[in-house]
């Protein structure tokens, strides 16, 4: 009688011998043609963000650092980390263990693109050192360029098609969950608040 490891190997070998016909990706031209578009993508993004509990702040390249300071100062003197704007004298987690993220009060970084229809912001590992920081911080601050806001998820995925990041996630609003009684709880599984800084010009 064959032992378990031998039986396992035999099964895997048999599976590898099977040649399945290659399936082509389904065409999604029809979906793209019917995808929603907005006359004002930035305005729609703001409405979507506020509807899911986020706050939106506008600034230009001249006062972006001041806006970051104002937003972070609202949450007191807690530890802020990995703020992707030069000129802020905050602590940085870049050389620390991911476990240190449990101490975060405010965590700020930049998003690559935003989506108007659902206020989702794409954050990749290019902008963060420890991905767990996005979930463990009490308050999350994300910066997005107004020109990087697209209409819908179809356009967002098209822009991400050729990007090869090891990790990335769409974030929309603060953490939210609801039980069977439909009691909404904010911040149970992630950040309690989300502030979005939209840079224009």
Give the ranges of each region predicted by the language model:
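The feature marks the mature, well-folded catalytic cores of soluble enzymes
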Residues: 1-201
């Amino acid at each position: 009688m064959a032992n378990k490891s031998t039986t396992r190997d035999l099964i895997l070998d048999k599976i590898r011998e099977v040649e399945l016909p290659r399936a082509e990706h389904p065409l999604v031209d029809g979906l793209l043609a019917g995808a929603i578009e907005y006359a004002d993508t930035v305005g729609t993004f703001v409405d979507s963000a506020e509807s899911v509990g986020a706050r939106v702040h506008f600034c230009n390249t001249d006062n972006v650092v001041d806006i970051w300071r104002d937003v972070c100062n609202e949450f007191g003197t807690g530890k802020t980390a990995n703020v992707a704007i030069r000129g802020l004298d905050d602590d940085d987690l870049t050389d620390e263990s991911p476990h240190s993220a449990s101490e975060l009060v405010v965590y700020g970084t930049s998003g690559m693109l935003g989506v108007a229809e659902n206020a989702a912001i794409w954050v990749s590992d290019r902008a963060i050192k420890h991905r767990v920081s996005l979930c463990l911080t009490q308050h999350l601050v994300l910066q997005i360029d107004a020109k990087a806001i697209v209409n819908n998820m179809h356009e967002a995925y098209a822009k991400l098609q050729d990007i090869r990041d090891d990790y990335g996630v769409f974030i929309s609003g603060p953490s939210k969950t609801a039980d069977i009684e439909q009691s909404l709880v904010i911040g149970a599984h992630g950040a309690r608040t989300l502030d979005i800084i939209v840079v224009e010009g």
